[in-house]
């Protein structure tokens, strides 16, 4: 039992999901839903607890869906994320310098056009 909690705590610092995290999630939602069922019974069917039960059930379904989608995606570690960020930064710098060169060319062309139109008017 203690090993479960140790692995659960360690899984917090790892990317992705672990079996301990999934089990803890399901146990938490079952406890929440059982508590809401008991509150519905204890309050003779208070509508607010029905609403909370529905919201909790839909949230649990959404979390299950998200966990399944997350298991299909390849997660990147920090080194891969740094490499991708550096590539994006390098390409952005390169694009900015190309844009500045092109805008400099278009500015000089616009100046020549303005000078020509002034000389025609004179």
Curated annotation (Swiss-Prot):
Chain segments carrying region Disordered: 82-122
Topology relative to the membrane: Multi-pass membrane protein
Pfam families, per the entry: Pkr1
Cytoplasmic topology ranges: 1-20, 68-122
Compositional bias segments (type: Polar residues): 104-122
Main location: endoplasmic reticulum
Keyword tags: Endoplasmic reticulum, Membrane, Transmembrane, Transmembrane helix
Listed InterPro entries: Pkr1
Gene Ontology terms: cellular component: endoplasmic reticulum; endoplasmic reticulum membrane
An example Gene Ontology biological process: vacuolar proton-transporting V-type ATPase complex assembly
All ranges on the Lumenal side of the membrane: 42-46
Annotated localization: Endoplasmic reticulum membrane
Membrane-spanning ranges: 21-41, 47-67
Composition bias type Basic and acidic residues, residue spans: 82-103
PANTHER family per the UniProt record, alphabetical: V-TYPE ATPASE ASSEMBLY FACTOR PKR1
Function according to Swiss-Prot or TrEMBL: Functions together with the other V-type ATPase assembly factors in the endoplasmic reticulum to efficiently assemble the V-type ATPase membrane sector V(0).
Further facts: Present with 5750 molecules/cell in log phase SD medium.
Similarity remark: Belongs to the PKR1 family.
Protein name per the record: V-type ATPase assembly factor PKR1
Organism: Saccharomyces cerevisiae (strain ATCC 204508 / S288c)
Lineage of the species this protein comes from: Eukaryota, Fungi, Dikarya, Ascomycota, Saccharomycotina
């Amino acid at each position: 039992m203690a090993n479960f909690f140790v692995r659960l705590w360690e899984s917090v610092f790892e990317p992705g999901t672990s079996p301990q995290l999934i089990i803890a999630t399901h146990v938490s939602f079952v406890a929440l839903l059982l508590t809401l069922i008991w509150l519905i019974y204890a309050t003779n069917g208070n509508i607010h607890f029905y609403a909370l039960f529905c919201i909790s059930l839909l949230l649990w379904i959404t979390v299950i869906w998200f966990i399944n989608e997350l298991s299909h995606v390849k997660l990147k570690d920090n080194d891969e994320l740094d490499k991708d960020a550096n590539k994006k930064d390098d390409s952005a710098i390169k694009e900015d310098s190309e844009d500045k060169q092109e805008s400099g060319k278009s500015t000089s062309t616009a100046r020549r056009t303005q000078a020509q139109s002034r000389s025609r008017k004179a």
